[in-house]
From Swiss-Prot:
Compartment(s): Cytoplasm
Residues that coordinate or bind ATP: 30-33, 51, 87-91, 415, 496
GO terms for MF: ATP binding; ATP-dependent protein folding chaperone; isomerase activity; unfolded protein binding
Species in which this protein is naturally found: Gluconacetobacter diazotrophicus (strain ATCC 49037 / DSM 5601 / CCUG 37298 / CIP 103539 / LMG 7603 / PAl5)
Enzyme Commission no: 5.6.1.7
Stated name of the protein: Chaperonin GroEL 1
Family membership: Belongs to the chaperonin (HSP60) family.
Isomerase found in the keyword field: yes
Keywords linked to the UniProt accession: ATP-binding, Chaperone, Cytoplasm, Isomerase, Nucleotide-binding
Function: Together with its co-chaperonin GroES, plays an essential role in assisting protein folding. The GroEL-GroES system forms a nano-cage that allows encapsulation of the non-native substrate proteins and provides a physical environment optimized to promote and accelerate protein folding.
GO cellular component terms given for this protein: cytoplasm
Subunit structure: Forms a cylinder of 14 subunits composed of two heptameric rings stacked back-to-back. Interacts with the co-chaperonin GroES.
């Protein structure tokens, strides 16, 4: 086992604080509308330019083991805030730095660290309640757009696009962000259920120009197994031909004689038909086929349920207004399923989302829910260069998360104002001793840190700005760093999602409290490497020999 290096008390805290400062100073330059960019070196490809706090935090690794521990703890703050709220990582980092700094001073002055932490925790609970009390719910698309615009660093186009996407797919729809191939950023909304399987054979195409198969008002056969022979389903095919409507077959696979027969019938014009493979794999495939069946009002033809192809009737098939099949995607529009059944299925999926502990499973369940309940929107981010596209994509991701958070929990005035004003809640608290009171005082000072940093990044004096803002009794009155003026921030559209502000404070105080109460640190001692052998220069003592 390698030897360990141990540091105690003030020495440990000082080393840790240096690490906290290095990471926080690199992250906090990005805060606010006039925050700067940070360039991240990559081991391959061009450097990455970003204004995303968590991306900067994740890149920082310090040589000194003790300093690195402090930096990693604050990195954890940024990551946790990002996971829960999706934005506010820089605010959380600034708060954590402020709490740790003030806390370290208090401990050095002889305060009890555990009482300080209790005071900090009590103060944070009071501030969170104050934030909730002053929260305003979002009701209009314009307010949604404002939140997106603020988080995208004042880019109005992005805010508008996110607002449109949320209107179209609803609160449970899925919105994804991708890189576009062109210069422009665009919004693409898929209505209905789309899954990533295309036609099995290009002979099913109905529109050769666009390379798609369009089926209007089709029947949909949902089969769990592979189809190799059509013999068992001939009675069903005859019924479909008599009805004069097209047929879509969704099965594990269609091959051999079955595929050849379908293609020949399609080409001769006797049967309007198309076949696609079932989406997903294993148990997820069964669940997705069940989703399609509920959406279209059909049944999954499965031998597990005792249903054989020979006994299938038209009543067991699903129906939809339109189906479009492309090379790699199939979209079912306006399925004929009963709305109560669809709602019931959505409730079932929501319950599974609540129960699952896997992020991957949660994401897949969320996608299934969106396909049933809302729809899917894709924001394709464009730009002149790859570096620009990546930087914009970071901002769009942040804006999207912030907007979702705002719809979920409401909004408060932005620009760090809500936190600074929430310190009024600390006046009525009662503490068991003076050390706990000092803990609350640490939070009171830290609450001004984001407002001061936003002002500082805009080239103003943070202390003067904070003082001027807190002089006013108007809750919405604050500093607009973009213009350098004081105004009603909510009316001006400068707003923050309550969830983002709340999460940033809770995560920052949690980790900062742990750092303050640290009394010893243990790290691996760097091994002293033995000096390398000198370059070989022949045998010594032979230089003056005669040959």
């Amino acid at each position: 086992m390698a030897a360990k290096d141990v540091k105690f008390g003030g020495d440990a805290r000082q080393r840790m604080l240096r690490g906290v400062d290095i990471l926080a100073d690199a992250v906090k330059v990005t805060l606010g509308p006039k925050g700067r960019n940070v360039v991240l070196d990559k081991s391959f490809g061009a450097p990455r330019i970003t204004k995303d706090g968590v991306s900067v935090a994740k890149e920082i690794e310090l040589a000194d083991k003790f300093e690195n521990m402090g930096a990693q703890m604050v990195r954890e703050v940024a990551s946790k805030t990002n996971d829960v709220a999706g934005d506010g990582t820089t605010t959380a980092t600034v708060l954590a730095q402020a709490i740790v700094r003030e806390g370290a001073k208090a401990v050095a002055a002889g305060m009890n660290p555990m009482d300080l932490k209790r005071g900090i925790d009590k103060a944070v609970i009071a501030v969170v309640e104050e934030l909730k009390k002053n929260t305003k719910k979002i009701t209009t698309p314009a307010e949604t757009a404002q939140v997106g615009t603020i988080s995208a660093n004042g880019e109005h186009e992005i805010g508008e696009m996110i607002s449109q996407a949320m209107q179209k797919v609803g609160s449970e729809g899925v919105i994804t962000v991708e890189e576009a191939k062109g210069l422009h950023t665009e919004l693409d909304v898929v209505e209905g259920m789309q899954f990533d399987r295309g036609y099995i054979s290009p002979y099913f195409i109905t529109n050769a120009e666009k390379m798609v198969a369009d089926l209007d008002n089709p029947y949909i056969l949902i089969h769990e197994k592979k189809l190799s022979s059509l013999q068992p389903m001939l009675p069903l095919l005859e019924s479909v031909v008599q009805s004069g409507r097209p047929l879509l077959i969704i099965a594990e696979d269609v091959d051999g004689e079955a595929l050849a027969t379908l293609v020949v019938n399609k080409l001769r014009g006797g049967l309007k038909i198309a076949a696609v493979k079932a989406p997903g794999f294993g148990d997820r495939r069964k669940a997705m086929l069940e989703d399609i069946a509920i959406l279209t009002g059909g049944q999954v033809i499965s031998e597990d349920l005792g249903i054989k192809l020979e006994t299938v009737t038209l009543a067991m098939l699903g129906r939809a207004k339109k189906v479009r099949i492309e090379k790699e995607n199939t979209t079912i529009v306006e399925g004929a399923g009963a709305s109560d059944d669809i709602k019931g299925r959505c409730g079932q999926i929501r319950a599974q989302i609540e129960e699952t502990t896997s992020d991957y499973d949660r994401e897949k369940l969320q996608e299934r829910l969106a396909k049933l309940a809302g729809g899917v929107a894709v924001i394709r981010v464009g730009g002149s260069t790859e570096v620009e596209v990546k930087e914009r994509k970071d901002r769009v991701d942040d804006a999207l998360h912030a907007t979702r958070a705002a719809v979920e929990e409401g909004i408060v005035p932005g620009g760090g104002t809500a936190l600074a004003r929430a310190s009024t809640a600390l006046g009525n608290l009662h503490f068991h001793n003076d050390d706990q009171r000092v803990g609350a005082e640490i939070i009171r000072k830290a609450l001004q840190a984001p407002l001061r940093q936003i002002a500082h990044n805009a080239g103003e004096d943070g202390a003067v700005i904070a003082g001027k803002v807190l002089e006013s009794n108007d809750y919405n009155y604050g500093f607009d760093a973009q213009i350098g003026d004081y105004k009603d921030l909510v009316a001006a559209g400068i707003i923050d999602p309550t969830k983002v502000v709340r999460t940033a404070l809770q995560d920052a105080s949690s980790v900062a409290g742990l750092l303050i109460t640290t009394e010893a640190m243990v790290a691996e001692k760097p091994e002293k490497k033995a000096p390398a052998m000198p370059a070989g220069g022949g045998m010594g003592g032979m230089g003056d020999m005669d040959f």
